[in-house]
């Protein structure tokens, strides 16, 4: 029985298509298009007590902000307002504050993963507004020559040159966040995502 030339060519062609299909990446491996990328519209930056808006601008300029932005400091609802700085090796003040909170049944220290910040040889500990007005709390701080300070919160909005709202890719925002958090006057930077995905 003879196989016609056309059938042989067709079988060879199908074999090549099957082999090609086995050794190439499926469509599911194609990179996600850029329009599905997470977008960042701004950042909340927590500065040390006393940072002025001109100092904030200088810090941002030194970090080569490549997009236009506007700055809004200490307006609207911000996170924790007050903090104390405690030497990392000074366990006595932390122990006494903890005991005082238990005895007085008060929440002087705000505890969350974002409130205990290490800066150099100190911990930055967020404290409640209740604590700032509590004589017992203040007497413990006075005993250890520690003062209550106030965070300076600034919101950075990314903008187009005409002042309208803009965004940057998450990858760029994370890089910027990491660079900014290396600055001594900055305690934390949090990313503000745009929810239009």
UniProtKB/Swiss-Prot annotation:
UniProt xrefs under Pfam families: UPF0228
Top-level taxonomic group: Archaea
Family classification: Belongs to the UPF0228 family.
Protein name: UPF0228 protein MA_3125
Species in which this protein is naturally found: Methanosarcina acetivorans (strain ATCC 35395 / DSM 2834 / JCM 12185 / C2A)
């Amino acid at each position: 029985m003879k196989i016609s030339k056309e059938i042989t060519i067709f079988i060879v062609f199908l074999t090549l298509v099957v082999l090609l299909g086995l050794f190439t990446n499926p469509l599911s491996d194609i990179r996600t298009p850029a329009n599905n990328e997470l977008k960042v519209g701004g950042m909340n930056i927590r500065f040390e007590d006393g940072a002025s808006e001109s100092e904030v601008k200088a810090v941002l300029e030194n970090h080569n902000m490549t997009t236009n932005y506007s700055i809004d400091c200490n307006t609207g609802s911000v996170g924790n307002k007050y903090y104390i700085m405690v030497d990392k090796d000074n366990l006595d003040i932390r122990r006494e504050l903890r005991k005082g909170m238990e005895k007085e049944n008060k929440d002087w220290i705000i505890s969350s993963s974002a409130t205990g910040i290490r800066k150099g040889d100190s911990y930055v500990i967020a404290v409640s507004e209740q604590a700032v007005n509590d004589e017992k709390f203040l007497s413990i701080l006075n005993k250890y020559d520690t003062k209550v300070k106030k965070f300076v919160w600034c919101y950075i909005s990314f903008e187009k040159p005409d002042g309208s709202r803009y965004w940057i890719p998450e990858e760029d925002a994370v890089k910027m966040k990491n660079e900014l958090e290396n600055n001594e006057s900055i305690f934390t930077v949090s990313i503000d995502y745009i929810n239009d995905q």
